[in-house]
A protein has these predicted regions:
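Metal-associated gating/positioning segment near the N- to mid-region
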Residues: 49-86
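Hydrophobic/aromatic beta-strand patches that form the interior of the parallel beta-sheet core
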Residues: 6, 42-44, 56
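N-terminal metal-binding scaffold of metallo-dependent hydrolase/deaminase domains
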Residues: 1-38
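Short, exposed beta-strand "edge-strand" segments with a Pro/Gly-rich flavor and a Y/T-containing core
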Residues: 13-15, 40-42, 66-71
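Short, conserved beta-strand segments within well-ordered enzyme catalytic domains
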Residues: 20, 28, 45, 57, ...
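Generic preference for well-ordered secondary structure
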Residues: 10, 39-40, 57-60
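Active-site metal-binding motif and surrounding structural segment of the metallo-beta-lactamase
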Residues: 35-51
Length: 86
């Protein structure tokens, strides 16, 4: 089991709080997240950073005219996901 405790993060830009993530799933948000963390939790100080849910680009152009051979749908969507958009 892998756990990460994000401390001082600002969900949606609100007041700073802690977020506990266990095996890739958010398991606790708030001041009690640290108390629920296992002893071997990996701590990450995110003071001043904002946490947002996954972002979705609903308007995208893949394989622009004249550049069809430079990109495939697979490579274009993979590049978007690596860049933080799903």
């Amino acid at each position: 089991m892998t756990s990460h405790l994000l401390t001082g993060v600002r969900p949606y830009g609100e007041d700073p709080t802690d977020i506990l993530i266990t095996d890739g799933t958010i398991t606790a948000i708030g001041p009690d997240a640290a108390a629920k963390a296992p002893a071997d939790v990996q701590r990450h100080d995110l003071d001043g950073l904002i946490a947002l849910p996954g972002l979705v680009d609903i308007h995208t152009h893949l394989r622009e005219p004249g550049g069809e051979s430079a990109e495939t749908i697979y490579s274009g969507t993979r590049a978007a996901a690596v860049g933080g958009y799903t």
